[in-house]
């Protein structure tokens, strides 16, 4: 009789894998602070071109970027060197990212390693189908314009590959720091934004609660959403829920300090066993009012934490903040003129004709090339025609600038400036202006206002 051995299946725990990837010196420091805060639910990886910096990292998973490219000496503030180093170590980066469902890439923009390597790592993550979130800092103003331009270029490169991007200008640290704040404590404040964002996501999936969220909910809010903001607030005592929510939605460190109009919002309200239903409702409604977008995808979760007895913590991730911001067209040298759209064409031309060498833009310019030579000579001589001395006539427009010099202007403007306007500066019909000849509907009294040589032409 054959014996059948039946083994119990292995207890396989299926849960999303979240990786925090620190790049460069600033990214490595952020990971060190998160490890020191004992953040649970995430794996940590640091990557740097500086071998000495890697030695001091608390993280176990380390990548020496570009061994042949930099020889462990850093990128020298050159983003192209940082990018080349990351490309050299692409296989190692890919190995650490595999099996991850979500990755937070943190770096400081403006240097060499973070600015150049972060976009390469983000590209690899996207190729692996990983939900990718970038959390980066921008330089202080005292670091100079060159470093700021480098940072802006790096942010543009990174944004191509991340689903959501959070930018923290270091200059905003002055909003919350005082004269006693140490340099290390100030940077830790910036790192806390990343810490709070990762904790807000992991708590929703691993902490017990009445309303738990799965990874699909997280992905629905953060996938391909562009610029975002994160905020966390804690409060106790009276109105603690509302106060915590208001603190979460007004993070002074972020580049985008308002979540108004966000397309996706992730809300996590955490408290002790004393948290009430009305408090959860007050906090959630306060955030919804701030978003002020009826079409926003708002995903809400609430969890319990015994350590927060008497305290309510509200974490918010608002995404798609810049979805409706389309760059407006601004004409060249538009600051030189201040013309409203309601002004008539005559007013526009007179204002623009006094702007010196500023270009003149009009809706319709006649095709003077179609005129005969005689007509062109007649039209060209209009600026030499004498003006009437009647008091009710508009004075000739001055075509001299402040220096007394005659600026260069188009033929159309010179011609228009020499013509006299009637009826409260109303523009005459263009067919009378172009060739200077009245039509059959012209009144007999108006003929005397036409120069004699034109009157003969008409006769």
Swiss-Prot record:
Matches recorded under HAMAP family: FtsZ
Cellular component aspect of the GO annotation: cell division site; cytoplasm
Transmembrane annotation, as ranges: none
NCBIfam families, A to Z: ftsZ
Organism: Rickettsia bellii (strain RML369-C)
Role according to the record: Essential cell division protein that forms a contractile ring structure (Z ring) at the future cell division site. The regulation of the ring assembly controls the timing and the location of cell division. One of the functions of the FtsZ ring is to recruit other cell division proteins to the septum to produce a new cell wall between the dividing cells. Binds GTP and shows GTPase activity.
Location within or outside the cell: Cytoplasm
Region (Disordered): 383-405, 427-459
Any one Gene Ontology molecular-function term assigned to this protein's record: GTPase activity
Name of the molecule in the record: Cell division protein FtsZ
Pfam families from the UniProt entry: FtsZ_C, Tubulin
Coiled coil (residue ranges): none
UniProt: GTP binding residues: 25-29, 112-114, 143, 147, 191
Domain of life: Bacteria
BP terms from Gene Ontology: division septum assembly; FtsZ-dependent cytokinesis; protein polymerization
Assembly, per entry: Homodimer. Polymerizes to form a dynamic ring structure in a strictly GTP-dependent manner. Interacts directly with several other division proteins.
Similarity comment text for this entry: Belongs to the FtsZ family.
Keyword NADP recorded: no
Annotated keywords: Cell cycle, Cell division, Cytoplasm, GTP-binding, Nucleotide-binding, Septation
SUPFAM superfamilies, per database record: Tubulin C-terminal domain-like, Tubulin nucleotide-binding domain-like
Keyword Cell cycle among UniProt keywords: yes
């Amino acid at each position: 009789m054959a014996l059948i051995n039946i083994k119990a299946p292995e207890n396989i725990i299926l849960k999303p894998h979240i990786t925090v990837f620190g790049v460069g010196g600033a990214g490595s420091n952020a990971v060190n602070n998160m490890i020191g805060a004992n953040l649970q639910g995430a794996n940590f990886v640091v990557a740097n071109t500086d071998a000495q910096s890697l030695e001091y990292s608390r993280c176990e998973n380390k990548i020496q970027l570009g061994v042949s490219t930099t020889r462990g000496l850093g990128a020298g503030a050159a983003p192209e060197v940082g990018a080349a180093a990351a490309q050299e170590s692409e296989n190692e980066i890919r190995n650490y990212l595999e099996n991850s469902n979500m990755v937070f890439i943190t770096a400081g923009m403006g240097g060499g390693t973070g600015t150049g390597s972060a976009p390469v790592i983000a590209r690899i993550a996207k190729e692996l189908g990983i939900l990718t979130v970038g959390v980066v800092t921008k330089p202080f103003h005292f670091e100079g314009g060159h470093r700021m331009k480098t940072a802006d270029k790096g942010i543009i490169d990174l944004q191509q590959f991340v689903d959501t991007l959070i930018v923290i200008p270091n200059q905003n640290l002055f909003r919350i720091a005082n004269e006693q704040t140490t340099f290390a404590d100030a940077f830790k404040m910036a790192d806390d934004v990343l810490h709070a964002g990762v904790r807000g996501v992991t708590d929703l999936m691993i902490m017990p609660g009445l309303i738990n969220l799965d990874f699909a909910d997280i992905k629905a809010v953060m996938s391909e959403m562009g610029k975002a903001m994160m905020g966390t607030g804690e409060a106790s005592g009276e109105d603690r829920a509302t106060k915590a929510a208001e603190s979460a939605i007004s993070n002074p460190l972020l580049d985008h300090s308002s979540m108004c109009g966000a397309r996706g919002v992730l809300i996590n309200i955490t408290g002790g066993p004393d948290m009430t239903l009305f408090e959860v409702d007050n906090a959630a409604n306060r955030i919804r009012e701030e978003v002020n977008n009826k079409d926003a995808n708002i995903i809400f979760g609430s969890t319990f934490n015994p350590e927060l007895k008497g305290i309510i913590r509200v974490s918010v991730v608002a995404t798609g903040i810049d979805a409706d911001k389309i760059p407006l067209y601004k004409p060249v040298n538009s600051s030189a003129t201040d013309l409203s759209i309601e002004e008539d064409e005559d007013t526009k031309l007179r204002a623009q004709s006094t702007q010196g060498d500023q270009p003149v833009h009009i809706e319709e310019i006649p095709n003077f090339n179609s005129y005969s030579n005689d007509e062109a000579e007649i039209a060209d001589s209009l600026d030499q025609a004498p003006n009437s001395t009647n008091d009710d006539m508009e004075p000739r427009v001055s075509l001299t600038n402040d220096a007394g010099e005659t600026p260069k202007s188009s033929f159309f403007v010179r011609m228009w400036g020499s013509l006299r306007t009637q009826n409260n500066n109303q523009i005459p019909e263009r067919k009378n202006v172009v060739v200077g000849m009245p039509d059959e509907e012209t009144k007999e009294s108006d003929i005397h206002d036409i120069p004699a040589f034109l009157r003969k032409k008409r006769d």
